[in-house]
């Protein structure tokens, strides 16, 4: 290969690199981001994110990376005819952490979180304007329920039931505006009742019954007096 050929190759290669660099991170006439954009972390050359804009609006797929590199830790997919964005979070090894939709950067509708295998559902929950709203289910790796509870505007509301891995009810409590309020029953791992009573403003209130071998063993009324004696 002649020196002239080598020089021409280097010139063409440099021109292509400059052209590619000029094609990313551009603005339109109104000063809005347009076309392909990508940014690196300040402390390194590691890519932080890449994606495309259409006159200031995100379009298509955006990928976000951890400073250590690896698989994208978040992938967001935008569509031009919908206000919702499909979002999936990953570990740097590429296993799913959670997935769902966002609107105006707030979670909306059903979101799923996954066990460490990245495929088995661990949590299924509902969001409204970024707040938990509706039924929230937590599952063991087997798929059996571990917890079923209700939310309204980000607060626990109504009955919440916790289960053992064998499917036995471990406890059933009631919430009002994120505080324990109303009936509560606690069981041992065999499904036998151990304690039952009521809460008021997050504290035990009224008569609580304590069971032994299926029978009431003692009763305590709350609140108790200062020296702790009924």
Region locations from a protein language model:
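Glycine/tyrosine- and acidic-biased, solvent-exposed loop/turn segments at the edges of beta-strands
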Residues: 17-230
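Bacterial Sec-dependent N-terminal signal peptides
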Residues: 1-25
């Amino acid at each position: 290969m002649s020196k002239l050929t080598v020089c021409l190759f280097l010139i063409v290669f440099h021109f292509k690199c400059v052209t590619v660099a000029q094609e990313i991170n551009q603005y339109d006439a109104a000063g809005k981001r347009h076309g392909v954009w990508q940014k690196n972390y300040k402390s390194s050359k590691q890519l932080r994110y890449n994606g495309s804009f259409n006159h200031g609006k995100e379009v298509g797929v955006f990928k976000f990376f951890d400073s250590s590199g690896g698989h994208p830790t978040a992938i967001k997919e935008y569509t031009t005819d919908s206000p919702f964005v499909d979002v999936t979070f990953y570990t740097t090894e590429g296993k799913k952490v959670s997935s769902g939709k966002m609107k105006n950067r707030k979670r909306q509708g059903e979101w799923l979180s996954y066990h460490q295998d990245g495929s088995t559902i661990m949590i299924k929950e509902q969001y409204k304007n970024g707040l938990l709203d509706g039924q929230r289910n937590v599952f063991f790796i087997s798929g059996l329920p571990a917890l079923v509870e209700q939310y309204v505007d980000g607060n626990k509301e109504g009955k919440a039931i916790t289960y053992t891995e064998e499917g036995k009810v471990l406890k059933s409590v009631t919430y009002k505006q994120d505080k324990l309020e109303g009936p509560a029953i606690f069981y041992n791992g065999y499904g036998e009742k151990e304690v039952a009573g009521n809460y008021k403003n997050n504290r035990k209130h009224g008569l609580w019954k304590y069971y032994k071998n299926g029978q009431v063993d003692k009763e305590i009324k709350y609140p108790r007096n200062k020296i702790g004696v009924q």
